[in-house]
C-alpha cells in the first residue's frame, strides 16, 4: 500500500507516525510545501522569549530521522491538484516550478490553515506579520531586537495574540492589543477571568482596545506601517502589525475535488474520510465532534489534529475506530497567571444557543497563609445536570484539574456525581475538598432550589 500525506504539522506528522505503526510495510510519501518538516507554531512564544534557543528545535521530527524510518520526505513540494479517479496527485517544486505526477493508494490531507488577513486599505504594507510558521517566527525574532520597531499592534486577543503581546512587551516594545470582541480571550474564558487578565496585561504596560477593529493601515514613503486607524476613529502609532485575528483553511484549490462546507472546511465522516473514497483529511482544515453538544465544529488545537491523524491512519484500509469527541481543552499563561478551560462557557454557550447554568467560586490552593487564590467556574446543563465545561485560573499551576472535567464531559457525568468524586488530599498539595467538588456541590444547591 502506498500512502501519500500532504502537510507536515501536527496532523500530518501523527498520520505518518500512525501509518508506520499500523502498516509497517506501507510505502509513505510525505509532502511539505516549505523547507522544514513538523514545525510547531504553538512553540513560537518559547522561541521569542528565549526559552528555546534554536528555531529548528521547535519540531516533532527531522527529515533525516523520518527517512531513516523509510519515509520518503519531499520538502519544497506543493501538491497543486488531485485526481481521485486515477489516484494521482500533481506536485510542483516551489524552487524551480517543475511539475511531477505521483500515484497513491490512500491519501491524507493535513493542509492546515493560514492567518486571516485584514481586508482593509494598507493591508499590503511592509511590517505586517503573522505568528504562524517557521519563516514568520524568524522574522518576529528579528523584529524583537530591531531598534526601529518601538510600537507593536497585535490584532486579535486569542492565544496567539496574547502570546505575541506578552513576548514583545517583555522585549521592551510598547504593545497595543486591538480586538473587535468586548473582552480578550473571549473564546476561552468568561468575564470573571478576563477582567483579571486584562488588568494584569495593563499593569505590564500593554494597552487593550476592545469592541473595535481596524479601518485602515497607514504607511510612509517606504511602504512601511506607521499607524492604524480603528473603527472608533482613533489613530494608533505602529511600527509592526501582528495579525492574530483567526485563521482560514488552506483549501481553495480543493473545491472541485472534495466536499467543503461554507467555511471552506473539508467535510469528513467519523473516520476522517472525505467525500472521495481513499482520501482522508485531518487538522485545522476540518471539523471535529464537540463533546458537550455532540455537533461538529472547528477546534484548531494540536491534540485534536494528532487524534485525527492517528484515527485516519488506523482507518485507512477499514473503518475500525471513530475519532473521539473532544471538549476543546486548552491552557495558557498570562504573566504570573496560569489558566485552562474546557467545554462550554457562558459566552460560548450563548453564541451556540445552548442553555446552560454556571457557578463561580474562589478558593485557596492549600490550607496555608499567603496562599494563591484559585478561580474556578463550572458550567452544566440545568435540565440533565450534566457537566458541560469549566475554567480555572491561579498564580499557581492548577490547570491539570481541567483534564478531569474534560473526562467528566466525555463520560456525561452529572454535577451530583462530581460533587462527591474521589480526589486525593495532602495539605501541601490541595484541600480536603477539591475545588471541583466544591463547585459541583454549589451547582447542586443552585439546581435544588
Residue ranges and their predicted role:
Residues 6-10, 20-24, 33, 245, ...:
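Flexible, glycine-rich terminal cap/loop adjacent to redox cofactors
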Amino acid at each position: 500500500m502506498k500512502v501519500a500525506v500532504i502537510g507536515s504539522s501536527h496532523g500530518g506528522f501523527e498520520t505518518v507516525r500512525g501509518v508506520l505503526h499500523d502498516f509497517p510495510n506501507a510505502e509513505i510519501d510525505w509532502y511539505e510545501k516549505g523547507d522544514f518538516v513538523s514545525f510547531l507554531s504553538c512553540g513560537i512564544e518559547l522561541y521569542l522569549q528565549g526559552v528555546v534557543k534554536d528555531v529548528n528545535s521547535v519540531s516533532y521530527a527531522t527529515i533525516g530521522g523520518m527517512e531513516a524510518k523509510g519515509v520518503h520526505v519531499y520538502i519544497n513540494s506543493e501538491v497543486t491538484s488531485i485526481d481521485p479517479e486515477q489516484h494521482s496527485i500533481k506536485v510542483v517544486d516551489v524552487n524551480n516550478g517543475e511539475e511531477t505526477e505521483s500515484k497513491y493508494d490512500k491519501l491524507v490531507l493535513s493542509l492546515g490553515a493560514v492567518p486571516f488577513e485584514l481586508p482593509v486599505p494598507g493591508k499590503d504594507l511592509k511590517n505586517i506579520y503573522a505568528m504562524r510558521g517557521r519563516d514568520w517566527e524568524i522574522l518576529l525574532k528579528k523584529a524583537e531586537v530591531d531598534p526601529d520597531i518601538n510600537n507593536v499592534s497585535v490584532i486579535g486577543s486569542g492565544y496567539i495574540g496574547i502570546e505575541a503581546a506578552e513576548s514583545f512587551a517583555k522585549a521592551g516594545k510598547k504593545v497595543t492589543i486591538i480586538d473587535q470582541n468586548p473582552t480578550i480571550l473571549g473564546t476561552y474564558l468568561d468575564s470573571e477571568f478576563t477582567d483579571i487578565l486584562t488588568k494584569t496585561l495593563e499593569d505590564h504596560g500593554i494597552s487593550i482596545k476592545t469592541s473595535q477593529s481596524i479601518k485602515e493601515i497607514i504607511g510612509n514613503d517606504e511602504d512601511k506601517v506607521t499607524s492604524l486607524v480603528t473603527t472608533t476613529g482613533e489613530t494608533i502609532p505602529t511600527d509592526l502589525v501582528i495579525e492574530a485575528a483567526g485563521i482560514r483553511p488552506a483549501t481553495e484549490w480543493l473545491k472541485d475535488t472534495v466536499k467543503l462546507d461554507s467555511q471552506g472546511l473539508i467535510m469528513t465522516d467519523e473516520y476522517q474520510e472525505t467525500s472521495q473514497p481513499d482520501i482522508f483529511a485531518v487538522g485545522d482544515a476540518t471539523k471535529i465532534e464537540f463533546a458537550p453538544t455532540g455537533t461538529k465544529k472547528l477546534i484548531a488545537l494540536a491534540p485534536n489534529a494528532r487524534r485525527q491523524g492517528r484515527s485516519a491512519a488506523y482507518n485507512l484500509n477499514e473503518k475500525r475506530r471513530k475519532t473521539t469527541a473532544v471538549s476543546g481543552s486548552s491552557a495558557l499563561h498570562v504573566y504570573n497567571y496560569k489558566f485552562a478551560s474546557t467545554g462550554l462557557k457562558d459566552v460560548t454557550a450563548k453564541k451556540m444557543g445552548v442553555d446552560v447554568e454556571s457557578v463561580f467560586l474562589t478558593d485557596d490552593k492549600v490550607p496555608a497563609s499567603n496562599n494563591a487564590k484559585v478561580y474556578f467556574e463550572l458550567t452544566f446543563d440545568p435540565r440533565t445536570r450534566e457537566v458541560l465545561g469549566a475554567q480555572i485560573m491561579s498564580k499557581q499551576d492548577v490547570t491539570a484539574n481541567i483534564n478531569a472535567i474534560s473526562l467528566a464531559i466525555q463520560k456525561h457525568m452529572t454535577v451530583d456525581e462530581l460533587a462527591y468524586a474521589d480526589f486525593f488530599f495532602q495539605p501541601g498539595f490541595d484541600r480536603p475538598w477539591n475545588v471541583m467538588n466544591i463547585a459541583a456541590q454549589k451547582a447542586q444547591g443552585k439546581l435544588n432550589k
